[in-house]
């Protein structure tokens, strides 16, 4: 029987032995190449050159250095065989000159080949006792050497060769056959080395169409090879097997047979598993397949739905109470539940992937059939499955056990009918998990415990709004967040005093002004400053104009000497010159709409322009215009904060006899632009008598004084702030300015 002798060729042919070098009885001097596999009946056989594997005959001994035509002609059978290449004496010397090869004493390629033939099999019987390697008294004469010093002769390669083929028929006589054979084609390969000993039997195919022409039978000294046609070879084999079909094998039939054989082999091995488990003392669980047809009531047609396969696992010792376990986590993540067949099991599963198309004609939409149940750790309202509805219950929880208690298919169908008529009022949740994470429960009769409870309780809790809006207002934590943010922010600002009053006014919740102080009493004091009639008229006219036509107040570096001053509690800017000089780098130019001419005292470093129409200089800027917006603010401002307001000075006309001296004094004070002291603005005397501003001739009043009928500040001066909303807008703008 021919056997492969070259491991290199086997290494490059993982799926087939075609192209491997074979020999008879491990005789490396008579080798050939396994061309292809043919099918004779139901058996498969390898095809190669017959003269290479036929039983050899004894040939006369030839000297190693005799490589002449006379020596080769001694084995010739006729004049037609003089051009046939025969280097059969030593396969290691093929296409080489023996005299040109020099071997070292330690070379592994040195092989002593005795050309004298003692028997037909070229095998010399050696007694076991004569072997030196088994003699303990004889030392090993081999010397060590580096692996790269060893000379390896290239021999018997299985790489494919390319060339051109001539369609010319001829007869060729081979010495070993003693007859002539038909050779239909002759090919001339394009390779560095010509065909050597052992290449007989190599298959020749077309490089473009993969058509098999035949196999190599001989070669000549010119490097040309002779091919035996495959058709003639199959006809010769058919003559020896009249009742069998001889042809090249069909790959599809072979693969189908291999798959069937593998399936049967695996089935036999799995059938022996229970016996092996019993031998180990274990109780195996039998596995079988059960088909369930998803049918509901008569109004629903599920004839187009295929059958669902799932594995039912039961224990041998509990036949009456069988358990159906859910599928483990070995399922793929891209599983989709549609109308294709789904097989559920612990080890063998066939899943429909997400990219497989589903015909719309075989799908009937029915809402409320498929339901999605979330795990208890993440409760959420369920939603119907997208696409085609499947009458099965879906669960994402693992480790849950369901009991069947002998349910028949009729009971299962009635249960599915109830599922089809279930309540569909549950709203779909767009944030719910995708159904690709779900698993089909093997048993559909028993619903998962707590499914309805989890869904209803979660949904009702999401929609419950029993709290009163007033309670929500009381629980509002926005002011506290503002308080914390501003408290941490003012620790980083260079001027922390600017935010102290602002944060207290914006974030305090519980302080309110008592009702008895809603409308403050305004009285004139005997020591009020008296101005001239011209000044009184100008002040009255200006206040009326501001009440009728609110203008845009510009806050910038103020140069007017008669502007309204700021409270002295905030660091005053004192100057002995005639004008106010403020560092322009420390403030920002801002313009905002406001219907009042009064500004909060916490706005340090800014002074509004004088309301008079005189030729006093005004500060003009290109700033942001921020009109006030009506934003409600429920909190109150501390009552101990005072704000000065203009007084109707027209009632002071009768006091002209005292006005001359007072006016001169006041003009002198205003031109000098002296900042009022804290005692003059916020006196510590009687609270019922509002103090008077010595700089702008105004009376201070409580800013939190509210009227009972309207939600406005109880300030009669028409040119001042008239709503708490405007105050909040002003404070919000100041906070943004200080932060940014």
Swiss-Prot record:
Keywords, ordered alphabetically: Virulence
Region entry Disordered, spans: 353-391, 414-434, 514-535, 656-686
Compositional bias per record (Polar residues), positions renumbered to this chain: 668-682
Keyword match Transcription: no
Keyword presence, Metal-binding: no
Feature: compositional bias, Basic and acidic residues: 656-667
Pathways involved: Mycotoxin biosynthesis
Function, in words: Part of the gene cluster that mediates the biosynthesis of gramillins A and B, bicyclic lipopeptides that induce cell death in maize leaves but not in wheat leaves. The nonribosomal peptide synthetase GRA1 incorporates respectively a glutamic adic (Glu), a leucine (Leu), a serine (Ser), a hydroxyglutamine (HOGln), a 2-amino decanoic acid, and 2 cysteins (CysB and CysA). The biosynthesis of 2-amino decanoic acid incorporated in gramillins could be initiated by a fatty acid synthase composed of the alpha and beta subunits FGSG_00036 and FGSG_11656.
Protein name: Gramillins biosynthetic cluster protein FGSG_11657
Organism of provenance: Gibberella zeae (strain ATCC MYA-4620 / CBS 123657 / FGSC 9075 / NRRL 31084 / PH-1)
